[in-house]
Each structure stands twice: as structure tokens, then as C-alpha cells.
């Protein structure tokens, strides 16, 4: 039952006290005995249910079983609670819940004395033997109680398993009296007061006495006293009978304590008198004054004359001793003053001789060591105001003599300057000593300042580490470092890298894609590594028609129409160097600039699409209209003619930014040869496009790089077909 406050607060208080009593700062598995006794008082006072107290100790065992020292201190605390907390707590300790946890989990799993790992560790072996000794001791203490027989059964079970229990030297002295502890009694219920026998009602309410557990009215239970014998240190309600018993117990103890204090005070007075008498005798012997024989106090003196005589004798002896001690003290003081004066005179004479003999001597005089007194440390004499004024005046005059040549001769023979020189020269040694002293002090203060700064820095680092450990101010994710782009990646891409992407990528980058360089963070679209944007060279002036060429004759329009046909740069077979020559071929070709400041580069389809060249360029775009990159091989096919002869033009696909990709390691070694063999040459494509009689191109805003003609060497070039040139229209 919970009498004082809420049970949760009491539980927290008990857990904290258990943790402090078995703190890890206590060495060798010992206990903090005052805190441990507070734990036992808290359990014995029944402020918490006994099962809750047992579970608090069990929880502490579970928290400390991996540390042998903490486990030893916790086991000792459990043993102390068993011997001081009463029968209500023993019933919970002897339960199956606690004993099985102690024996089956802590002992047999972690500290089994039969295990070779435990035997190799001295600390674990000591803990295992401590558990066995405690179980054996508890079984002896609980042998006379049938309610606590489960501990005895656990002991017998371990004994049958051939565990060696330690022997006790005083086993016969252990009995049930070690666990007999006075605890608060259980409450008794009744309908009337046990003193006045008045029945309880709405007005006359009943109250329980914490000392005896009886029921009493307000009149006979209005007393509040602490019950220390029951482990209750706070004032609690008690009846009149229990109050009278408590007072009767305290009276003889107070009487005994008062008589004992009187006896001790008398003994102390006698001892002081004896010590004073001995001191007086010793002092009189030193001064060679005759000492009168001490008068024995034990002799019976009935007359008043003997008392006065002894008092007078004591007074005379005391006065003589005081006078002798004062005389010795005065002599010692006089001798000390004379020695001090003599030493000061010697130091002044020595210092004066050093100044007169050599004022360049910078050594500070060291006082001689005297056996009778400590050496006197002389402070460095500072300059007076007059001396400083003389020095400043001398410096000013000498400065004027050096700078002004007209008055230099007159000033050099001036008597005042000569007098100042005689005054200033003896001060040189004093100034030098002051300078040396100041420099030493400055060095000392600098060292102290450095030490204080170092200590402050170490303290701040220690405080920061503690704050980080406490509040978790730790950087969980390291800062993202952008990959550096080397010179190889910054250089211009080869024609191979511009025209053929990595295998498995057959579509361009979308227009809404933000390049990683604009955001500052690396992005990896499609699971590929980011490739920095390559610089694109300017297109030659003859590669695209200008605005002036568009206004010329219709004959020139036909030529411009031929030059605006999308052409594809097929690298020759010999332009693909081996793996070691990639860096040399990086700067062979350059891309021309695209119209409208947009980079729209078309690349070859992936390897798996060579069998079907009419596959869409952007397989993932379902909403856009699909186009064929190359026209069909048959120049005279009806499907291609119908497609190009239709009056309505198909919508132009929006331009997309192209991500330049480096050559993938998965590209077949003969991919270029296969591509040039499967696809027709560029001349055939131009002729087929001219025969289609279509006035517009599918991609008017797209231009493709044209490789140099001297490097293009197709393997098999089909014969060209003759196509008649259409006649120009006559304007009417």
C-alpha cells in the first residue's frame, strides 16, 4: 500500500537511490553504505509495494550483469535489504520470479563456475562464487520459514548439479534472527475507537496508527512522530499509547547520556589540570627557580586554612612560571630584532659597494642563508620622480647638442650638464636592474597567459564534447563534395563522342532538365554518371545559309535547300584509334553551333536497334509524334513517296538539349563498321531526299556536323542514280 505521495514518484526515488548506492564510481564492487541503508529504510517503511521494490532490484541486476563490479555491489545491496527490510519483502525475494532470474539467467548463462571462460576470468569467477555463497546463506536463514522454502529448493538443485559452494566459518551462528526486522504492522479494521470505544460516523472519522496499526478517533490519534525503529523518518500519525511508549524509551537514554556527559566533563577537567601542572614544573626547571612540592588533592582537608595555603602556593608557582616565560619571549624577540638589523645593514653596504665599484654589473645580489631565519627577498628599487626628471632632462640636452652644432660647444662645457651626468651615471645600474626585472615579469606573465589560454581552450573543447554527447549536436551526414573536373573532361569531345552515345541511350535530354553545373549539386539522370558540358566550336561560315543568301535567285534556293539537308557525320574506319590513343583523337572534330542557341545533336540509335532503322528516336515519349531518323532504303518505295508528297506537314518535334556522353565500355569493337555497312552513305540519302519533292524538311531547326571529306572512306558505295534537276518556275 502507498501511504506517502504517489507510487510513481516513490518508485523513481527508489530507483535513483539504488543506482547511487551501486554507482560505478565505487571501486571493487563495494557499496555506498549510507545510501544503501536509506534504500532499506524506504523498503521497510512500506511506502512502496514489496513486489515493486523487488522488481527495482531485479531491474538493476539486469542492467549491470555484464559488469562484474557493478553486479557484485548490486548483489551485496540485495543481501543487505534481505537482512533489514522485513518479512513482507522476503516473500517477494523468495519468489520464483526473482530466484529463477538470478540462478537460470545471471548465474548459469554469464557466471557459471563450471564454464572454462568464467574460470579464466578472475572477476567473473569471484562473482559466480559470490552468487553461490549468497544462495547458500539465504537458504540457511530461510530454513525455518515455510513461505520462503523456494530458496532452499534452488540451493538443493544447484547442489545436486555438483556446484561447489564455499564454506562458512560461522555457519552455526546463522539463524532466522538475522532476518527478523521490525516493520510497520498491518492495519486493523474496526467500527469503533480502540481507546474510547466511540463509534465512527460522518463526524467522528477513523484513523490508523502507523506504529501499531490500530483504529482510533481523531482525539486519540492526533499525534505525529517519526518512527525510526520502523524505518520511517518522516512524522506520521500515532495513537496516544504509542506516543507514551516512544517517550518512555527516550527518557532513560537521555538520563544516561546526561550522566555520561557529566562524568566525561569531570575527567576532562582533571586531565587539563594535570597537564597545566606539568607545564608549570617544566618551565620553572628551565629558569632554575625552586619548585614547591605539589599538594595531593586526594588527602582529606577539613579545615579552610589548608585550602587557602594550597591556593596561595599554586598562585605563586603560576606567577613565577608566567614571569619566566615572558622573560624568555622578550629575550628571543630582542635577539631576532638585532639579527634583522644586522642583516639589513650588511645588505645595504654590499649593495652600495657594488654600485660604486661597477655599475655595469647586472647581477642581482643574493642574500646569504642564515640558519636562524629565512632569507630576506629584496624588491627591486624603482626610480623616484626626481631621478626620472634628471634622466629625461639629460636626454633632452644631449639630443639638442647632437642636432644643433651652434650650441654644442657651449653646452658641452656647461656645469648643469656635467652635474646631470654625474647624477645619471650611478642610476644606470638601477635602470638596468629594473629593466631586467620588468623583462622577467613580462616573460612570467606571458607564460601564465599562454597556460591560461591553453587551459581555457581545453576546457571549451571538453565542454563542447560533453554538450555534443548530451544533446546530440553531431553532424550525421558529411558535406557533399563536388567532383573536380580534370583537364581531360574539360577538353573538346571527339567526333566519335559527339556523334555516337553510350550503348543503351537512344534519346536526347529533355528541355526542362537543369544541368548540374547550374545548381551546384551533382545529378545522375538515368543511373549514369554526370558528364560536364563540353565546349562547342563555332560552325564554319559556309555550313549554313545566311539571311542574304535567302533573298537571291531561285537557283540559289535549290543549292541552299541541298545544304540544309540533315547530314550525318560517319567517322571513317581508321578514325577509331585503340584504347591508348583516345586522348590524341579528342580534338579532331568540332560541333557547329545550333540555331536559336539550342544544342540539338542527333546521335546514332543503340546497338539493338540496327535491325530496324525506322524505330522512333525517343522510345519513352508517348505523347510526341514519332519520326524516322533515316528514310527507308528503297528510294522508289511508294510508302516513302506518299509520306513526302502529302500536302500537310507533320508537326515539328520540339528541340531538346543533348547530353554529351562519353564512350561506354559496353560498345562492341566493330560497331562503326556494322553501322556503316547497314546504313546507306550520305550521298544516297541526299538523293532520296531530293527525289521526294518535299518543300520542307522534317527538322528545319536541326543541323548536323559534317565530317571532313578527306577522312570519309565508305567501304561499299552504291552507284549514284541520275536525278534530273527541276526547271525553275517563271514568275508571271
Curated annotation (Swiss-Prot):
It is a peripheral membrane protein. One of its GO terms (molecular function) is ubiquitin binding. PANTHER family: VACUOLAR PROTEIN SORTING-ASSOCIATED PROTEIN 27. The keyword Cytoplasm does not apply. It comes from Scheffersomyces stipitis (strain ATCC 58785 / CBS 6054 / NBRC 10063 / NRRL Y-11545) (Yeast). This is Vacuolar protein sorting-associated protein 27. Residues 253-266, 492-501, 596-612 have a biased composition (Polar residues). Zn(2+) 1 binds at residues 193, 196, 217, 220. Residues 329-340, 655-664 have a biased composition (Basic and acidic residues). Residues 23-166 form the VHS domain. GO terms for biological process: protein targeting to vacuole; protein transport to vacuole involved in ubiquitin-dependent protein catabolic process via the multivesicular body sorting pathway. Residues 271-290, 313-332 form the UIM domain. Residues 502-513, 520-542 have a biased composition (Low complexity). Residues 245-272, 287-316, 329-357, 483-732 are annotated as: Disordered. Component of the ESCRT-0 complex which is the sorting receptor for ubiquitinated cargo proteins at the multivesicular body (MVB) and recruits ESCRT-I to the MVB outer membrane. Belongs to the VPS27 family. Its main location: membrane. InterPro entries: ENTH_VHS, UIM_dom, VHS_dom, Znf_FYVE, Znf_FYVE-rel, Znf_FYVE_PHD, Znf_RING/FYVE/PHD. GO terms for cellular component: endosome membrane; ESCRT-0 complex. Zn(2+) 2 binds at residues 209, 212, 239, 242. PROSITE patterns: UIM (PS50330), VHS (PS50179), ZF_FYVE (PS50178). Signal peptide: none annotated. The gene is VPS27. The FYVE domain is involved in the binding to phosphatidylinositol 3-phosphate (PtdIns(3)P) which is required for the association to endosomal membranes. Both IUM domains are necessary for efficient binding to ubiquitin. SMART domains: FYVE, UIM, VHS. Keywords: Endosome, Membrane, Metal-binding, Repeat, Zinc, Zinc-finger. Component of the ESCRT-0 complex composed of HSE1 and VPS27. A zinc finger (FYVE-type) spans 187-247.
